[in-house]
Amino acid sequence: NGSKWIPSGGVVYKLTPDISLYANVAKTFRPQSSIASYYGNLPPEEGVSYEIGSKFEIADGLTANVALYTSDKKNVAYSEVINGETYVQTAGLVRARGVEVDVAGELTDELSMIASYGFTDAKVLEDPTYAGKWPVNVPRHTGSLFFTYDFGEVGGNGNTLKVGMGARGAGKRAGINTNAYFLPGYIVADAFAAYTFQMERPLTLQLNLKNILNKTYYTSSIGSTNLGNQIGEPFSAVLTASVKF
């Protein structure tokens, strides 16, 4: 039982009609009672993050957001194996600094895009065993790129068709606290097609294809050689129907 004050704040300054500057600061607090009940008493994870950035228009219908951030966290839980047994402990201080870039909007009347890129420099700063190591499951590079094309009316009666395709990926990540091995980076491709029947209540059939090349990849590690790695979703196809009321 108890309470914790977690302040946060931000400010936005509109430099011009097309350019906004912003800054945010926030403290974080996360109890670790769910795992502490099994592994023993663990202190809560606490941290503070700072972010500055700008939102602006690149061209008519195309906007971008660029942000710089730094985040410090203490008491970050990690697992390790000692004499065949898995234990959970906490690192003294973990720092992550990076940049995020997002671009979205219309390239033409028919073609639109969403693109993102992130760079993260993360390191364990204070820990008797792992100081200077790369934190588990934190990629240095992440990114995605997706295009959507609107064919407009197809098949008559006002019926419309949209298709899209893109890719998402991440760079290599530390698989264990000692950095003895790394999960390899990956890029997977996705696609979709949506056909809308113009009726009294428009009906849309949409086919979503995930990992269309059926690439084997790993999304994360438990951080312990005893427990292994999480394999990414294989190829899947999902057809959905929706009605607009």
Could you describe each region identified by the protein language model?
Residues 23, 50-51, 136-245:
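Conserved C-terminal beta-signal and adjacent last beta-strands/turns
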Residues 15-18, 58-60, 74, 107-109, ...:
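Short coil turns and loop connectors of transmembrane beta-barrels in diderm outer membranes
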Residues 1-16, 37:
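Signature of Gram-negative outer-membrane beta-barrel scaffolds
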Residues 12-15, 44, 54-56, 105-109, ...:
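Residue-level signature of outer-membrane beta-barrel architecture
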Residues 70-72, 90-176:
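Gram-negative outer-membrane beta-barrel transporters
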Residues 14, 20-26, 44-106, 114-118, ...:
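Membrane-embedded beta-barrel scaffold of Gram-negative outer-membrane proteins
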Residues 32-40, 76-84, 120-132, 173-181, ...:
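Outer-membrane beta-barrel translocator domains and adjoining extracellular loop/strand segments
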